[in-house]
Amino acid sequence: MVYILIAILIFGVLIAVHELGHFLAAKACGVRVNEFSIGMGPQLFHKTKGDTEYSLRLLPIGGYCAMEGEDEDSDDDRALGRQVWWKKFIIFVAGAFMNFLTGLIIVICLYAGAQAFYTTEIVELNPDFPQQGEDGLMPGDTIYAINGERIYLKSDVPLIMGLGDTGTIDMTVLRDGKKLDRTLTKQVYTDENGQEYEAYGFTYGGIVEATPLNRLQYSWYQTMDYVRIVRLSLQMLLSGAAGVNDLSGPVGIVSTITEVGKETEAEAGFGAALESILYFAAMIAVNLAVMNLLPLPALDGGHVLFLLVNGIAVALFKKEIPSKYLNVINGIGFALLMALMLFVTFHDIVKLL
């Protein structure tokens, strides 16, 4: 039960942080905010300060930032619709920025006590590895990229190598500050027990002592890795390598957090379980940031796309696109988004049965 509550709290905090981003940006840009609410449902507490009503509501599952002129036309000069394009842009992307920043801060806190980090240094080559030496690989080379994907962390190597593994990879390594391109092919090797196995023939993963600077560096790498995971997941979805049934909604994510928490607690205690959940929370925060910036109606990225289209219309025809069309498009997009959410939630529940 405790992990379910933690999962719900994580969702609530991340959504509230997202709305806080919109709120702070709106205030900074001079846009009137009619209500800023933490939580949903019946009001537990509210206070009006200036033009804004601040609310605390019963259900800890998010919040909202209701701006003047957000969903309707308004004659108020402080209405969202009457602002210049760059102010709208800042307001629209501020929520995603706050989610990304939250994910980064969580990772920074988790890495604050790190004593060392694994690197992508090649530490050993199989004696039968066919490409040793100046024209191939050498111990001490640092893996920089695989198949065009930048490698930041040790965990990136198996992730990227496992994507559409054909038995051949294009690898870029750093040696004495220079980038060297190599093409590697899996070979058949024999282990100490005489068993044959197929591998690329190199071992990687040096160790570097943690410092205040590289703690920040590796925190950034880890956060950008979460961005890449979202991108790769979307690519797999669009290419057909993954289906809609592979998606997880809030129910599935709560189930995953609960499972991770219980398994880790059984193996290493509650502290380790909480640490694992916080890593997961950081990934969810970054996921929310990226997904909200997709150029789809009803999402922040959709609003940014409309800004671009509207700017083109003004440049070409000297006339803005009426906001009523935006409202219709957003309404349709929201309905489709809710339909997808219901579908994913249904499948999450079926998986639990």
Where are these regions (language model features)?
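PDZ-domain C-terminal substructure recognizer with occasional recognition of PDZ-binding tails
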Residues: Y144-A145, L159-A199, T203
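Functional transmembrane alpha-helices
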Residues: A79, Q83, Y189-L288, L308-I332, ...
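Small-residue-rich helix-interface/hinge motifs
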Residues: V2-D75, M291-I312
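Residue-level signature of transmembrane alpha-helical entry/exit and packing/kink sites
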Residues: Y3-A7, Q83-F92, S276-F280
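Alpha-helical transmembrane segments of multi-pass membrane proteins
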Residues: F11-I15, A66, N99, M283-L293, ...
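Conserved PDZ fold ligand-binding element
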Residues: G133-S155
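Internal alpha-helical transmembrane segments
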Residues: A28, T52-S55, L59-E124, N330-I332
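Membrane-helix cytosolic exit motif
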Residues: I106, L110, M338-K351
